[in-house]
Regions:
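Recognition helix of helix-turn-helix/homeodomain-like DNA-binding domains
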Residues: 25-38
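Residues in the helix-turn-helix
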Residues: 17, 28, 58
Length: 72
Protein backbone atom coordinates (compact mmCIF):
# COMPACT_ATOMS: atom_id res chain seq x y z
CA UNK A 1 0.00 0.00 0.00
CA UNK A 2 1.20 3.52 -0.75
CA UNK A 3 1.43 6.43 1.69
CA UNK A 4 -1.67 7.88 0.02
CA UNK A 5 -3.48 4.56 0.46
CA UNK A 6 -2.56 4.46 4.14
CA UNK A 7 -3.68 8.07 4.59
CA UNK A 8 -7.04 7.45 2.93
CA UNK A 9 -7.53 4.25 4.90
CA UNK A 10 -6.80 5.96 8.23
CA UNK A 11 -9.30 8.68 7.33
CA UNK A 12 -11.91 6.03 6.36
CA UNK A 13 -12.30 7.66 2.96
CA UNK A 14 -14.90 6.21 0.60
CA UNK A 15 -13.12 5.95 -2.75
CA UNK A 16 -16.40 5.82 -4.67
CA UNK A 17 -17.33 9.23 -3.25
CA UNK A 18 -13.89 10.60 -4.10
CA UNK A 19 -14.19 9.24 -7.64
CA UNK A 20 -17.61 10.79 -8.10
CA UNK A 21 -16.55 14.18 -6.72
CA UNK A 22 -13.20 14.40 -8.54
CA UNK A 23 -13.71 12.58 -11.82
CA UNK A 24 -10.72 10.36 -11.00
CA UNK A 25 -11.68 6.80 -11.88
CA UNK A 26 -11.96 4.15 -9.16
CA UNK A 27 -9.30 2.19 -11.03
CA UNK A 28 -6.89 5.13 -10.91
CA UNK A 29 -7.63 5.73 -7.21
CA UNK A 30 -6.94 2.06 -6.54
CA UNK A 31 -3.62 2.29 -8.41
CA UNK A 32 -2.67 5.42 -6.46
CA UNK A 33 -3.54 3.72 -3.17
CA UNK A 34 -1.93 0.34 -3.81
CA UNK A 35 0.82 0.55 -6.43
CA UNK A 36 4.02 2.19 -5.20
CA UNK A 37 5.22 2.61 -8.80
CA UNK A 38 2.21 4.78 -9.72
CA UNK A 39 2.97 8.50 -9.63
CA UNK A 40 0.47 10.87 -8.02
CA UNK A 41 -0.01 14.04 -10.05
CA UNK A 42 -0.39 17.40 -8.32
CA UNK A 43 -3.85 17.95 -9.80
CA UNK A 44 -5.01 14.57 -8.49
CA UNK A 45 -3.68 15.32 -5.01
CA UNK A 46 -5.43 18.69 -4.99
CA UNK A 47 -8.77 17.24 -6.13
CA UNK A 48 -8.59 14.40 -3.60
CA UNK A 49 -7.90 16.92 -0.83
CA UNK A 50 -10.89 19.02 -1.88
CA UNK A 51 -13.11 15.93 -2.03
CA UNK A 52 -12.24 14.82 1.51
CA UNK A 53 -12.17 18.38 2.88
CA UNK A 54 -8.54 18.54 4.02
CA UNK A 55 -5.71 20.96 3.27
CA UNK A 56 -3.72 19.66 0.28
CA UNK A 57 -0.53 20.36 2.25
CA UNK A 58 -1.60 17.81 4.85
CA UNK A 59 -1.75 15.06 2.23
CA UNK A 60 1.44 16.28 0.57
CA UNK A 61 3.35 16.06 3.86
CA UNK A 62 2.17 12.46 4.35
CA UNK A 63 2.76 11.34 0.76
CA UNK A 64 6.17 13.00 0.39
CA UNK A 65 7.47 12.47 3.90
CA UNK A 66 10.52 10.53 2.67
CA UNK A 67 11.72 13.23 0.27
CA UNK A 68 14.66 15.40 1.26
CA UNK A 69 17.24 17.63 -0.36
CA UNK A 70 20.65 16.15 -1.05
CA UNK A 71 23.38 17.09 1.36
CA UNK A 72 26.25 19.04 -0.12
Amino acid sequence: MTDLGLYLSRKSVNRSDVSRKTGISKTRLSELANNTKTKLRADELYLIALAIDVDPCEILKKVCKDLALKEE
